[in-house]
Amino acid sequence: DNVIDILANMGFFTQIERMADAGVLYQVISDFTADNADMNPEKISAIDMGNVFENLVQRFSESYDEEAGAHFTSRDIIYLMCDLLTMNADSYDEDTPAKTVYDMAMGTSQMLTCMEERIHALDKEAEIICYGQEINPFTFGIAKADMLIRGGDPENMQFGNTLNADKFKGYT
């Protein structure tokens, strides 16, 4: 169900039709099924897959100059924000069973990924539960796919307008 939700929100089926109409669908499928394109989790870690995914998101965003900010925020800026939020390392109680991170306008969810990384740098054993909501169906699909790739709970990624249909009331 999660994968179908992701594919539908990202317009995947429309893209398949476009590639077929353009005569490139066979080549794309051939490239992804080639011997050197083995993306088995035993060969590519979740972190590496996330980096590949982020690179694709960045390239996609750069192709839409006027809307790039709606899809992609530089990792440097995200890390700066995460560092500001985690400046007081003493506030991270190692006895707390789980830490939650919530992004009300998550875009592609890269802020959640970076925050998770920064918290793990402070406490390697921390259980981190990420939540997010996004109004744009395409970037929501990317965020939910990223959560699946990283092994998180995709149900914690919700589609909708946080201002008038908050799916995580009480999380802030």
Predicted regions and their residues:
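Non-catalytic, mostly N-terminal accessory regions of nucleic-acid modification and defense proteins
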Residues: 1-89, 156-165
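Conserved S-adenosyl-L-methionine
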Residues: 68-171
